């Protein structure tokens, strides 16, 4: 079985497990690491993902992999994780999950926008830029990036 076919079969295998847990599949990679393969499944949800949910779906995915031959006879390591803060915002759901966060995004027409995400829907995102509300369609934005903040002025001390 080729790498692409294996990846597609694996995605089909994990999809119902993740759907049952209320999680979205954000990424799926199979990478050779020495004599083994690393199977990395990246999951997320609008509520975020805690370690307990990661552990539960990891166990279910592991059991499902043991029941089928999608990985063949080669040994593998399964890693189920959530996306890091450096994941680019490319889908409407990514922008929704960034509500309240400071985001920097290039504009397709040139320039950039840097502001706090107020709201996002299926068509675009609303930023607070220096106290002013600015709305952009997703088609006007490049890949957004959440800015790491160690202290937010509105945060409680």
UniProtKB/Swiss-Prot annotation:
Q: Where in the cell is it found?
A: Cytoplasm
Q: Which UniProt keywords apply?
A: Cytoplasm, Ribosome biogenesis
**Per the record's keyword annotation, is rRNA-binding included, yes or no?**
no
- GO CC terms for this protein? cytosol
Q: Does the keyword Cytoplasm apply?
A: yes
* PANTHER family in the cross-refs: RIBOSOME MATURATION FACTOR RIMP
| Entry-linked NCBIfam families | PRK00092.2-2 (NF000930)
Q: What is this protein called?
A: Ribosome maturation factor RimP
What is the scientific name of the source organism?
Thermobifida fusca (strain YX)
């Amino acid at each position: 079985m080729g790498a692409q076919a294996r990846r597609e079969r694996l995605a089909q295998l994990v999809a119902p497990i993740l759907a049952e847990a209320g999680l979205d599949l954000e990424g799926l990679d199979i990478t050779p690491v020495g004599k083994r393969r690393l199977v990395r499944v990246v999951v997320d949800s609008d509520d975020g993902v805690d370690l307990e949910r990661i552990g539960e779906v990891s166990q279910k995915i592991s059991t499902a992999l043991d029941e089928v031959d999608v990985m063949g006879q080669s040994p593998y390591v399964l890693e189920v994780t959530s996306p890091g803060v450096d994941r680019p915002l490319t889908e409407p759901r990514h922008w929704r999950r960034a509500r309240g966060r400071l985001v920097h995004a290039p504009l397709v027409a040139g320039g950039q926008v840097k502001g706090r995400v107020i709201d996002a829907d299926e068509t675009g995102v609303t930023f607070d830029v220096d106290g002013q509300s600015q709305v952009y369609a997703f088609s006007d934005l490049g890949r957004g990036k959440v800015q790491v903040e160690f202290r937010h002025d509105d945060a409680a001390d």
